[in-house]
């Protein structure tokens, strides 16, 4: 009996079609050059650099946002405008004293349909909070190690970011104190 060195491609049990994405879609979704216009790279760069206008440009009109595994809410169809308001808020990623870098590790892609893909990503998000917007003195650090499902939809031939579902594996330092809106006054003093 001979074994094939080519791994089997997963198929949908109902339709028999492949769940694999095309090579071109793989390139489009995961290109890592700084000048690209693709959602995975732009998502991490725009959040890390608080580049809100360019982040907004890669969003689908409605996003599935599921923060239930990190103790927050779930939205089945959050508008892009509401998503932008949430992430750019001073109590979250818009705080001028918070700097982040989101690094993506291993990734695999799952095709849901011709126009929908789920990216399964390992993620390390480093955060530093400074005492003031001049970014001279570090107040605290907090880093998160997680896996994320990122959702993408293809519209007009272009992939758009359509949501996320993070699951934190573990945090370092004082992650729970990084975002002003992430914990209550009573938790601050406990």
Swiss-Prot record:
Substrate binds at residues 67, 148. SUPFAM superfamilies: NTF2-like. It comes from the Eukaryota. Keywords: Lyase. One of its GO terms (biological process) is melanin metabolic process. The active site is at 102, 127. GO terms for molecular function: scytalone dehydratase activity. The keyword Lyase applies. Its EC number is 4.2.1.-. Belongs to the scytalone dehydratase family. Homotrimer. Each subunit contains an active site, located in the central part of the hydrophobic core of the monomer, which functions independently. Scytalone dehydratase-like protein; part of the Pks2 gene cluster that mediates the formation of infectious structures (appressoria), enabling these fungi to kill insects faster. The product of the Pks2 gene cluster is different from the one of Pks1 and has still not been identified. This is Scytalone dehydratase-like protein Arp1. It comes from Metarhizium anisopliae (strain ARSEF 549). The gene is Arp1.
